[in-house]
Amino acid sequence: MAGLEMGLLTMKKGEFSRFLFQPKYAYGDMGCPPTIPAAAMILYEVQILDFLDSGQVDEFVALSREEQNAVPLPRLLEVVNTVQIFGNRCFNQRRYHIAKDRYKEAMALLVSRESHTDAEKEKINAALLPLYLNLSVTQLHLENPHKALKYGNKALEIDSANTKALYRCGKAYLELGEYESAQGCLISAQAKKPFDGDINNLLREVTICFKDTLDKQKDMYTKMCRDFRGECK
């Protein structure tokens, strides 16, 4: 609605306002039956709890690849941070598909950057690390363990001792039924954080699943050997 959009543009974070709109700024002469009658004046009560200014993101994305690479790195990092914050909000609202898309958008902006110095590459990797971690956990929520593992491993390429990445890779391996690999990741994570409850609980779960699998394999091989001996008599 035109009136509400105009009103919101006048407000600040935390502000509470009431707007009374004439029909032409609300639902017009037709109204919105059956709830809103024709030519109705509308009273809105609005409070701005928080907002995200995406203006600089839109401006940056509209640039050509050459123009983006010419932009100072601090500005790029600001744009990436804004996109990441939006992704975090969506994640916290359990809107995982949208969160994934925002994280991937931020990641693409960083990956496409042409870095000419080691210092700049380090800053880009530092910004990529939380995005890879966020993508990994988001893919776990979306039940895509292969993709969760992909991004977890990308995070480990930047920081091989990152416990969040090790934990998420361990969880992805568990969901894929690759218990030995899961155990290896979680043991490495446990070595860094021996008293972390999430790591210890998941490691315990993996150990139980791994033992059950080995026991079943042992029983199967025992039965196969028994059947083979029977055929040879």
Which residues fall in each region the model found?
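A beta-strand/beta-hairpin structural motif
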Residues: 1-39
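Alpha-helical segment of the N-proximal tetratricopeptide repeat
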Residues: 73, 78-111
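Alpha-helical adaptor scaffolds
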Residues: 96-165
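Intrinsically disordered, low-complexity, charge-biased linker/tail regions
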Residues: 204-207, 211-233
